[in-house]
Amino acid sequence: MRAATITSAGKGTGMKIAITYILISVLASVIGQLLLKVGMNKMGSITLSAGQFLSTSWKMATNPYVFIGLAIYLAGTVFWLAALSRVDLSYAYPFASLSYVVMLVASWMMFDEKITLGRLIGTVVIGLGVFLISRS
């Protein structure tokens, strides 16, 4: 059984709500990933060997940045599922790539990561693609 979805032709309040859910999901994904990175930076480089898997996993799970990052990521997933209940997956999914656009800037600002020409061009292409799909 196929759930009723709002198509781009049926834009209105329902579509605005769905897009809001998608954008909250994207933002939660970015914030969650940033917190995961902060937590892992505090832990340092890890190796997942058979003998250390459980202890390393426990250290990650009890790291407050990792824990909160995962919680925010999970909350974003709830908003994503709410969006999927309202719109076609083929319409919603490209919006998830907006996280790449936001992440490029956030990683540069928070972690002093370099923005190479290739990353910049790729991010612009993603942004243009999302714009085109949002207009369909």
Language-model region placement:
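Polytopic alpha-helical membrane proteins, predominantly small-molecule transporters/carriers
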Residues: R2-S136
